[in-house]
Amino acid sequence: MKDRAGCCLIVFILAMAVLFGIINDDKTDIITGLAVGIFLYASAPILVIIFIVLIIICILPDSTNQEPAMKLYIYDHCPFCVRARMIFGLRGLPVEIEVFANDDEAGPTALIGEKVVPILVKPDGTAMDESLDIVRFVDEYAGKERLDDTIRPEIQAWLDKVGKYSSRLTAPRCVQIGLPEFATESARAYYIKKKAAAYGDFAENIARTDEYLAQLHADLPELAALIYSEGHIGERLGYEDIITFPLLRNLTMVKGLQYPEQIRFYVERMAKQSGVPLYYDKAV
């Protein structure tokens, strides 16, 4: 029995020494571990148990502070990028986000072969684009209940209708609210030249804000009637949220916007759930 007790003493003391060295990543702490081991063993068994529990807690990985396994390249204003950002927040997954300058063609081209965002660099180091493909990949990667893939025709029809004029409200404003992709004059000039060709002169669109806002306010009740709850547009969290929230979020940069209560509650709740902030405080 004495031999067995002696062996246990030696094993325990050595274990304490090794654990101290591992935790502190310092060989000099092995001496401290030896001293602690001797003290605990000579004291009471309960102290030994408590110390072992504390050691286990210290060496277990902290799931709340996990390193991002993926990297997402975006523009802050881009609704397709918002789709990709949403799924990480909704699934509670960490992701490193990097914002390209709007006139940076080399960065995205080096990753995916063309100037496009969002771009996701996956855990294996390969890159992928297409916002909904990214959403599906991350949704599967999370290993939780999948998003509802139902998109009601009424939702799609509303998005198509409002999408015909909503960019005339948001495109001229996103270069005015201090977004990182427009930090340089060259990035702003690049965007203005490209988008003015698609949506018309920015100054003219700003001048017609009241007209476009009136049209939007007339269309919003139709969407409000389709919202099931504050937490999701459909019966449960799904792709209707992924394709609708980005447009509603971007419209919050328009000063004078008045959302019906159902939409306002939904937008604010989804911003918190997804971790994608709104633009109310920047509205112009």
Residue ranges and their predicted role:
Residues 15-21:
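Aromatic-anchored segments of alpha-helical transmembrane domains
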